[in-house]
Regions:
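Conserved P-loop NTPase-based nucleic-acid remodeling module centered on helicase motor cores
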Residues: 89-131, 271-338, 688-690, 701-704
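Hydrophobic, well-ordered secondary-structure scaffolds
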Residues: 220, 227-241, 250-251, 493-520, ...
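Well-ordered alpha-helical segments embedded in enzymatic catalytic cores
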Residues: 198-206, 232, 329, 502, ...
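Conserved helicase NTPase catalytic core signature
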Residues: 336-517, 530-531
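Extended, charged low-complexity regulatory segments
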Residues: 1-196, 200, 204-205, 743, ...
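A positively charged, amphipathic N-terminal helix/segment that binds anionic biomolecules
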Residues: 158-160, 230, 341, 345
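P-loop NTPase Walker
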Residues: 1-15, 20-24, 28, 74, ...
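Conserved helicase motor core of SF1/SF2 NTP-dependent helicases
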Residues: 242, 256, 260-272, 277-281, ...
């Protein structure tokens, strides 16, 4: 292939840019006092003062900039735009109205000091939007000072490795797709990849959507939902860098393993300080010591062991626990509980009324109404304690006066002697005993007073809530029966958390939080009530929810439609953006996935369009015995390893089956690892795992080890699960079974292997 006509010019520009980056890196190291690249020598005095805090912040910012410069030394940019802004247009960097200028786009912006000239524009900058969404010709983009219109005359893409120009091409749509296909053909590592250089137009729209408005992203499997959500966070931090810190953005993921999977890409995007947790982890932080212990319920694993009637019954319970309508019921119940907790009698000390029922109600329901319930009880208690102290002090003073009067009478009536002294001692002893009794009575009085109020124990109130719901509607009785056993053990299950969070907010209040944008991944498995609870906790509409309705394998606990959260939660209905292009898997793999979901279509999920990247047909091996089945799987995995594939998943339906399979696989492939529900680190390599763990992950190759009709019945639930399994691999997909293959593969374009699985 002939070398590009401007190759030498671009190599010279790259060399010049790399020298500038090196100079800026050396300046940054000198500014920080770094010698020999040893960042550990940096020390900032921390004496708790405001000056020390400012110094720490400035140092962190400088270190972040230094890290970005070091990364830029390997690849300072990946694209070039030649753009001529119209006359009078607001401009960025070196752009001038009416002048055709070249702008280089990189993962990080590079400023040349001391004049602070933009040598490389950050991919998140407004002008970089032209790279992702513009084609040569008339274009425009939104800048802080207004809309910029003009003529885009060139889009050029570069491949740069370790500071050397390895490839370049001037792109229209065709060239860009070729560049994307080459990037997707690479072998995976044990981590999610950043895709700054290959963001597509539909993804770019999602990334740059208004950060203050709610957004739902319906993305087909392999459309880059998670990756794009992380890039959206990076863009938000760039866009709102003056008002939002990384710690004020939150990623909610389904489990610790998934968090491990995504966490390694965050430093590449400069967002490693963003908070990441699960919903349970967030509840722990918000509720503190009020957070109940959770039963370690592997819900999907349990569902996989159920028959359809049992699964349907569980789905009904989950649906009721996660329904948005439950929010109104919780509010109603708290109002009723609020009133039922008030003592129905005057609070007396002996015959003296310390606080009347009417006063209790006024303090509790009116004066302290702005406090949560338990805080109100505490505030009323302060009033009672104050009055109790005054009453005891008054009684003590009366007792002292009485003793003084009796002592005075004794002194006047009797001469000094043993008898008078004995009577005086008796008088003082009686006084001291009475004072001790009064002090002890204070303690017992307060215990008795506290017992007059209704319970504020979270799990007790939650149990009372479902008893109330069951009494109002017998259809809620199964929910009560399913909930009480765990509560009796002072535990809850994950699906209880949204309601518990709302109850805790009303009962005690929650710890304050300054989160300004929330990203919820795998949002199809989040209940409407959970979204509502999060909205109430954070008190803003800055939410990004990404998911795929086709992968909703947690039954009715999750969303059946994005319309489930379309009304009644946010200030305005969320925009629903669709990512319909599947980038992960080859055309041949996606054709199998389409066939699987075609048997049980999901309303509103959309139809996936695979990138035109071809590979080998998925295979189906029907073995005569289990031994043949496992042996065939092992041979296949060994073949994949010889071909150089790094990320391989061997999937069994259940954890028990995965454990047994791993025991067989590891004898022939020692590096094979058994991944379980409790693992919180995604390491890559050959991994044997059960079907409940793979959603959201991707691999080079996947072997579904038990793809028979008995293991995966022809039901909607199993169709969704099978679809998830089919859409995990980038390059290779194999099904193995003994007996009749799953009906999900009945019309799927798979290549049959012989019964020995060779």
């Amino acid at each position: 292939m002939a070398q590009h006509a401007e190759w030498n010019h671009e190599q010279a520009h790259l060399d010049e840019t790399l020298q500038i980056v090196k100079n800026e890196r050396e300046k940054a190291e000198a500014d920080l006092g770094i010698v020999g690249g040893n960042d550990r020598m940096i020390q900032v005095i921390d004496d708790g003062s405001d000056d020390a805090l400012v110094a720490q912040f400035v140092t962190r910012m400088k270190l972040r900039g230094l890290h970005q410069l070091r990364l830029s030394e390997k690849q300072p940019y990946f694209a070039r735009l030649d753009f001529t802004p119209d006359a009078g247009a607001p401009v960025f960097g070196d752009l001038k109205p009416g002048v055709n200028s070249a702008t280089y786009i990189g993962r990080w912006g590079v400023l040349q000091t001391p004049e602070y000239r933009v040598r490389v524009a950050d991919w998140r900058s407004p002008v970089a939007n032209l790279y992702y969404s513009g084609q040569v010709g008339r274009v425009s983009y939104e800048a802080p000072d207004g809309r910029v219109e003009g003529e885009l005359t060139l889009k050029r893409m570069f491949t740069i490795g370790q500071g050397r120009l390895e490839g370049m091409q001037d792109t229209g749509l065709v060239g860009q797709e070729k560049f994307l296909t080459e990037a997707l053909s690479q072998v995976t590592t044990a981590r999610l990849r950043e895709v700054v250089t290959t963001i597509q137009a539909e993804q770019n729209t999602v990334i740059r959507y208004d950060p203050m408005l709610p957004l739902c992203v319906q993305g087909v499997a392999g459309s880059g939902k998670t990756t794009i959500a992380l890039h959206r966070i990076a863009w938000i931090l760039y866009r709102l860098q003056k008002t939002v810190a990384p710690q004020q953005l939150l990623i909610l993921a389904p489990n610790p393993l998934f968090l491990s999977y995504i966490s390694r890409v965050l430093p590449d995007l400069g967002v490693n300080e963003v908070r990441q947790t699960t919903f349970a982890g967030l509840c722990q932080r918000l509720m503190g010591k009020r957070m109940p212990k959770l039963s370690q319920s592997a819900r999907l694993s349990e569902r996989l062991l159920m028959n359809k009637p049992a699964r349907d019954a569980l789905d009904d319970v989950l649906k009721r626990k996660g329904a948005l309508s439950l929010r109104g019921q919780i509010s109603r119940f708290l109002t009723e509980w609020e009133k039922s907790c008030i003592p129905g009698q005057d609070v007396k000390l002996g015959e003296r009324v310390l606080i009347s029922t009417e006063e209790l109600r006024r303090f509790y329901l009116t004066d302290f109404r702005h406090f949560p319930l338990e805080v109100r009880v505490g505030e009323v208690r302060k009033v009672v304690v104050t009055r109790l102290k005054k009453a005891v002090e008054a009684a003590s003073e009366r007792l002292e006066r009485t003793v003084e009067e009796r002592l005075d009478a004794l002194l006047r009536s009797m001469p000094d002697g043993p008898e008078r002294r004995a009577r005086a001692r008796k008088l003082f002893d009686a006084r001291d005993e009475r004072l001790a009794q009064m002090k002890e009575r204070q303690k017992t009085f307060l215990k008795e007073y506290d017992a007059l109020w209704g319970s504020m124990d979270l799990l007790a109130v939650y149990a009372a809530f479902w008893r109330d719901m069951a009494a109002r509607d017998a259809a809620n009785l199964p929910v009560l029966e399913a909930t009480l056993p765990a509560l009796a053990k002072k535990r809850a299950v994950p699906e209880d958390l949204p309601a518990l969070l709302l109850l805790a907010s009303g009962l005690y209040g929650l710890k304050r939080t300054d989160i300004k944008h929330v990203v919820i991944d795998e949002a199809q498995d989040v209940s409407p009530l959970q979204v509502n609870a999060l909205r109430e906790v954070f008190r803003h509409d800055a939410f990004t929810l990404v998911g795929d309705l086709c992968q909703g394998i947690y039954g009715d606990e999750g969303l059946r439609s994005w319309e489930d959260i379309g009304q009644g939660i946010f200030g305005q209905s969320p925009e629903v953006a669709r990512l319909s292009t599947a980038y992960r898997s080859t055309v041949e793999i996606m054709e199998v996935a389409f066939s699987v979901m075609g048997r049980h279509p999901v309303l509103g999920a959309g139809i996936a369009k695979p990138v035109l990247r071809h590979g080998k047909k998925p295979t189906l091996a029907v073995a005569a015995t289990d031994r043949d089945r496992v042996a065939g799987i092992i041979r296949t995995v060994q073949g994949w390893l010889r071909e150089g594939y790094a990320g391989i998943a061997v999937i069994a339906k259940t954890e028990k089956a995965a454990r047994a399979l791993h025991q067989a696989v590891v004898r022939e492939i020692p590096q094979a690892r058994h991944v379980t529900q409790g693992d919180d680190c995604f390491e890559g390599g050959v991994q044997v795992m059960d079907a409940s763990l793979v959603k959201g992950l991707e691999f080079d190759c996947v072997a579904v080890s038990d793809a028979d009709a008995l293991t995966y019945p022809d039901e909607r639930f199993y169709a969704k699960l099978f679809y998830v399994l089919c859409t995990r691999p980038l390059h290779r997909l194999k099904f193995a079974c003994v007996g009749e293959p799953a009906r999900h593969l009945e019309n799927a374009p798979v290549e049959r292997e012989n019964e020995e699985g060779r």
